[in-house]
Swiss-Prot record:
Binding site for glycerol: R83, E84, Y136, D246, Q247
Organism: Francisella tularensis subsp. holarctica (strain LVS)
Principal EC category: transferase
Annotated disulfide bonds: none
Enzyme Commission (EC) number: 2.7.1.30
Gene: glpK
GO CC aspect terms: cytosol
Protein origin, superkingdom: Bacteria
The keyword rRNA-binding is annotated on this UniProt entry: no
Similarity comment: family membership: Belongs to the FGGY kinase family.
Record keywords: ATP-binding, Glycerol metabolism, Kinase, Nucleotide-binding, Transferase
Function field: Key enzyme in the regulation of glycerol uptake and metabolism. Catalyzes the phosphorylation of glycerol to yield sn-glycerol 3-phosphate.
Protein name per Swiss-Prot or TrEMBL: Glycerol kinase
Record GO terms (molecular function): ATP binding; glycerol kinase activity
Classification via SUPFAM superfamilies: Actin-like ATPase domain (SSF53067)
Length: 502
């Protein structure tokens, strides 16, 4: 039977998805299922790892069945996943010892504060992992599980526990425990991986008291990791051939193969990445240095700005405040007025990411008067997304010395034309929206396809990607500068709030 398709596994923060692509990049079928968000305490976020696997395996079967594709027609599987979220499980039984601790979870802030008391070690972490010390990353989450789950430390020291980011957890289950591996992009998000030596960093592991025996093997992003167990997908042994964290996969899906090319993904969070080539560039502006992907043992590096709350702010004005009935309504209300009338909303619900890295910042709405209406709050929420992206991209310009030559965008929020136009205005730059919005999944599929010869080279991949719409700046630079100064003032009001008022 001919191998005409590649299956993308897209395991996100709020849902598990499976998408079948053909050789022209067309989507044959999408299946999606949401799963439970667990909030045990304020600032804590967890997922049930077994529910993640259950929903993911379910949507894979659903996509195949309703897409009328037989497992034997799948040339390869590409995996892309929410990053930093980590699972610790029993090596023998495959059972998690605790819920997955999600990237948004702030429970390890105190561990990070302890690390920050040693400036030399903080410097070591930045120079060798490319990351800042923050509760966002996987390393301190693993330490918390080992320190707080009864019996976990003893089992880990005895070599009976394994850990992994979500890609590793999925690979383990797809292969029924035969493969315990991750790729360079996901490894680079743990705060445990040395992006210079391309090895797990023993000094950091020792500091956090994490046994190296728990850690997965690190492989190329485009490489056959193993095959699905014969009991997983209708008896077929399908190569798992592409793996990348969601933002890295999106950069690859946008075909940002050359140094200086950048993309921004608008999802639960907002993530801008710029390809900086085959050598890491370290930021003076609060950006992260990360491995974008690796092929044939050679990494491509990127600068990244991470914004924690983007799509979630629209969910909040819908579900928390009841200002809109649907996310789509936000565009309608935002365009009913000419401006926010000086209102700014800073959605620092779980702190601020790049370039501020303030774990204790909290959300604020400033500039309210008796004239403030629902429309002003809604528009301010949308504008906050664009302002945060500008914060990040301005830092990239400073660190690389490169002007932004257009920005490639993807994610759910790119369907909001008001937001995309405002983003173009505030950046004073062209915004390109591709016809295929499933760019993250496409990137995973591209990586898998290259590994198994489904596509011959990157030039062929570029021919698949086409542009749907280009947004050009319509606002003058003086007005933009004025509005951006207001945003910066609003951010200052949100900083250190939880620290001051806890």
């Amino acid at each position: 039977m001919s191998k005409d398709f590649i299956l993308a596994i897209d395991q996100g923060t709020t849902s598990s998805r499976a998408i079948i692509f053909d050789k022209k990049g067309n989507i044959r079928k999408i299946a999606q299922k949401e799963f439970t968000q667990i909030y045990p305490k304020s600032g804590w976020v967890e997922h049930d790892a077994m529910e993640i696997w259950g929903t993911q395996s379910g949507v894979m079967r659903e996509a195949l069945e309703f897409g009328r594709v037989k497992p034997d027609q799948i040339a390869a599987i590409g995996i892309t996943n929410q990053r930093e979220t980590v699972v610790v499980w029993d090596k023998e039984t495959g059972d998690p010892v605790y819920n997955a601790i999600v990237w948004q979870c702030r429970r390890t802030s105190s561990i990070c504060d302890e690390i920050k008391r040693d400036p030399q070690f903080v410097k070591y972490i930045k120079e060798n992992t490319g990351l800042v010390v923050d509760a966002y990353f996987s390393g301190t989450k693993v330490k918390w599980i080992l320190d707080n789950v009864e019996g976990a430390r003893e089992k880990a020291n005895a070599g009976k526990l394994l850990m992994g980011t979500i890609d590793t957890w999925l690979i383990w289950n797809l292969t029924r425990g035969k493969v315990h591996a991750t790729d360079y992009s996901n490894a680079s998000r743990t705060m445990l991986f040395n992006i210079n030596s391309l090895e797990w960093d023993k000094k950091i592991l020792d500091y956090l008291n994490i046994p190296e025996s728990m850690l997965p093997e690190v492989k190329n992003s485009s490489e056959v990791f193993g095959v699905t167990d014969s009991h997983t997908l209708g008896g077929a042994e399908i190569p798992i051939a592409g793996v990348a964290g969601d933002q890295h996969a999106a950069l690859f899906g946008h075909c940002c193969f050359e140094k200086g090319m950048a993309k921004n993904t608008y999802g639960t969070g907002c993530f801008a990445l710029m390809n900086v080539g085959d050598k890491p560039v370290y930021s003076d502006e609060g950006l992260l240095t990360t491995i974008a992907w690796a092929e044939n043992g050679k990494p491509t590096y990127a600068l990244e700005g991470s914004i924690f709350i983007v799509g979630a702010v629209i969910q909040w004005i819908r579900d928390g405040l009841g200002l809109v009935r649907s996310a789509e309504d936000s565009e309608y209300y935002a365009t009913k007025i000419d401006s926010t009338n000086g209102v700014y909303l800073v959605p620092a619900f779980v702190g601020l990411g790049t370039p501020y890295w303030d774990m204790y910042a909290r959300g604020t709405i400033v500039g309210i008067t008796r004239d403030t209406k629902r429309e002003h709050i809604i528009r301010a929420a949308l504008e906050a997304i664009a302002y945060q992206a500008k914060d990040v991209l301005e830092c990239m310009k400073e660190d690389t010395g490169l002007d932004l030559a257009g920005l490639r965008v993807d994610g759910g929020a790119v369907q909001n034309n008001f937001l995309m136009q405002f983003q173009s205005d505030i950046l004073q730059s062209e915004i390109s929206k591709p016809k295929i919005n499933e760019i993250t999944s496409l990137g995973a599929v591209f990586l898998a396809g290259l590994a198994v010869g489904f596509w011959k080279d990157k030039q062929e991949l570029k021919s698949i990607l086409t542009t749907e719409k280009v947004f050009e700046p319509q606002k003058d630079s003086q007005a933009v500068a004025h509005d951006y100064r207001g945003w910066k003032k609003a951010v200052e009001r949100s900083k250190a709030w939880a620290e001051c008022y806890s």
